[in-house]
């Protein structure tokens, strides 16, 4: 099973590439790698990024989005990796701007996916907050690839356009007994400031 860290975004609102922003003196992407390695669930952790950022990562497994899918968002990153490793049974996807993802959350979601995989033939299992899916913290089956291809080819780059067409199910974030910042994504510098304050006050 492989993990995909999505790190190819423009980070315009944040003002700099979020992958290299730091929390507790550690870049976001390195903290996520440490968490994923700590689960002992993945045979490979792949960073999906763009050509501009690729050389800046201190990591050996990097896949660059294809030229025709440049600037097409998370879907392009997911597609780049799944099509490269299509024989893999399952992929865990996490956005690099979710730096406080926890081992507990990844393990719990995997259990949820496996429990529903055979009976419900799930293609995507992710988290939801107040009923709203969070498709950038989710497990994806390679069966999603044709739907991802279709979405990219039709210029509909939304993850929703994929998860609405396949069998998906979502685990409520409240079932993870951790401070709620574990699933929060960082869009602005003030989000990072707030997160650091929350960690200090924990």
Curated annotation (Swiss-Prot):
Example of a GO cellular component annotation carried by this entry: cytoplasm
Q: What class of enzyme is it?
A: transferase
Entry binding sites for Mg(2+): 97
* EC code(s) of this entry: 2.7.7.77
Catalysed transformations (reactions) = Mo-molybdopterin + GTP + H(+) = Mo-molybdopterin guanine dinucleotide + diphosphate
- Recite the UniProt keywords alphabetically: Cytoplasm, GTP-binding, Magnesium, Metal-binding, Molybdenum cofactor biosynthesis, Nucleotide-binding, Transferase
Q: Name one GO molecular function term.
A: metal ion binding
Which GO biological process entries does UniProt record here? Mo-molybdopterin cofactor biosynthetic process
| Compartment(s) of residence | Cytoplasm
Which positions does UniProt annotate for GTP binding?
A: 6-8, 18, 65, 97
Cofactor(s) of this protein: Mg(2+)
Q: Which InterPro entries match?
A: MobA-like_NTP_Trfase, Molybde_CF_guanTrfase, Nucleotide-diphossugar_trans
The principal localisation class reads: cytoplasm
HAMAP family, sorted: MobA
What role does this protein play? Answer: Transfers a GMP moiety from GTP to Mo-molybdopterin (Mo-MPT) cofactor (Moco or molybdenum cofactor) to form Mo-molybdopterin guanine dinucleotide (Mo-MGD) cofactor.
Any domain commentary? Answer: The N-terminal domain determines nucleotide recognition and specific binding, while the C-terminal domain determines the specific binding to the target protein.
Family assignment from sequence similarity: Belongs to the MobA family.
Task: Report what the protein is called.
Answer: Probable molybdenum cofactor guanylyltransferase
**What broad taxonomic lineage does this protein's source fall under?**
Bacteria, Bacillati, Bacillota, Bacilli, Bacillales
Gene that specifies this protein: mobA
């Amino acid at each position: 099973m492989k993990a995909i860290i999505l790190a190819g975004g423009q980070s315009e609102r944040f003002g700099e590439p979020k992958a290299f922003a730091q929390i507790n003196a550690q870049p976001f992407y390195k903290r996520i790698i440490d968490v994923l390695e700590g689960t002992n669930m993945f045979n490979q952790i792949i960073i999906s990024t763009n050509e501009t950022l690729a050389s800046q990562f201190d990591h050996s497994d990097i896949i660059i989005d294809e030229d025709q899918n440049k600037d097409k968002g998370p879907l392009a990153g997911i597609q780049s990796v799944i099509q490269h490793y299509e024989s893999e049974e399952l992929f865990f996807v996490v956005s690099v701007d979710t730096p406080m993802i926890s081992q507990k959350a990844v393990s719990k979601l995997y259990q949820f996916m496996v429990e529903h995989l055979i009976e419900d033939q799930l293609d995507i299992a992710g988290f939801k907050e107040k009923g709203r899916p969070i498709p950038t913290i989710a497990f994806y089956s390679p069966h999603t690839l044709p739907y991802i291809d279709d979405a990219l080819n039709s210029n509909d780059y939304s993850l929703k356009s994929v998860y609405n067409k396949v069998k998906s199910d979502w685990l409520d974030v409240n079932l993870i007994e951790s401070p709620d910042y574990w699933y929060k994504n960082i869009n602005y510098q003030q989000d990072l400031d707030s997160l650091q304050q929350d960690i200090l006050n924990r």
